[in-house]
């Protein structure tokens, strides 16, 4: 993948993408504004409680990755993203694609119907079919894929889609997504559906979930180490 983001980096990039469109008068954003945006109680999943120092540390990492840039304001430093559609970047997305990616970064896996409803402040999709077409494009782009379809949950009519910007987790999710796409093809031809294929799909999806949880444990362990170091000081 072109970008490998941890949970905090994904939240910061998502907030910058969101506010650039929804509140352009407040963009670029200050550290305080970004911290408030990251910790919003609505339109965020999971809800985070990041300190300004944690957000600043995340900004420093993103600066090193050249995914954001800073500029001096009248009184404070302000930040804008270089994640996509920037002057020197090669990652280009349409307004519809930006809206979908932003919501996936801020709220995690969602169905096409949920995305259509929740993106209305950034982009007005005509219907769910247009949302699904945008997701399909993002999953098939030659410079991607950028999203993946997850296994459909029991009792649900729609499958959820997940962003692919997290390294090893993305690889595992992509494998699960390919299995899910094969399952959709089989559903269109019931005679070709076999129980062992469903078992393989469930196994792959579980492996992807385990990989995602392992990544979260690693991130929490690093944060705990940082806290212990600060306490020792």
From Swiss-Prot:
Coiled coil: none annotated. InterPro entries: DUF480, WH-like_DNA-bd_sf, WH_DNA-bd_sf. It holds the Pfam family DUF480. Belongs to the UPF0502 family. This is UPF0502 protein YpsIP31758_2048. It comes from Yersinia pseudotuberculosis serotype O:1b (strain IP 31758).
